Amino acid sequence: MIEQILEKYPNDVKVVFKNFPLGSHKQARKAGKYALAADRQGDNGFKKMFMALFDDKDTWRGLRSDEDLPLKLAAELGMNVDQLKRDMQDPALDTQIDQEYNQLKSLGNAYETENFAGVRLAVPKFFINGREPVGRSFDAFSKVIEEELKK
């Protein structure tokens, strides 16, 4: 759906990814770190790694921490696996994840816990100029985008 939005609004929409690793997803922080490390390789590395890990999240979620699914995915994506391993050792990636987490947490109560008002939160979260669309359909997003463009 994000690709559809970017196609329809190529000059009006910018997608920004932020890490918000939930405690219930034991590999979430590591997945975010792999995406940030992949970003250093250019060629839209963050998005490619993020989407590959997210598309395979059920497998990824159940893995032990020492398994190498992200490295396998990186190789399939044509990334330099040795460089990815080196970049994963950089503490700056952990710092960035912490900063993004704290930034999103500061948005309010909905980000403070995984359950808010009895409703389980879902990630990823989407905001359009600070507004969260009701629903995750192309039409729901387009409605908010159109409203924002009129402002």
Residue map of PLM features:
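Structural alpha/beta surface segment adjacent to cysteine/selenocysteine redox centers
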Residues: 1-75
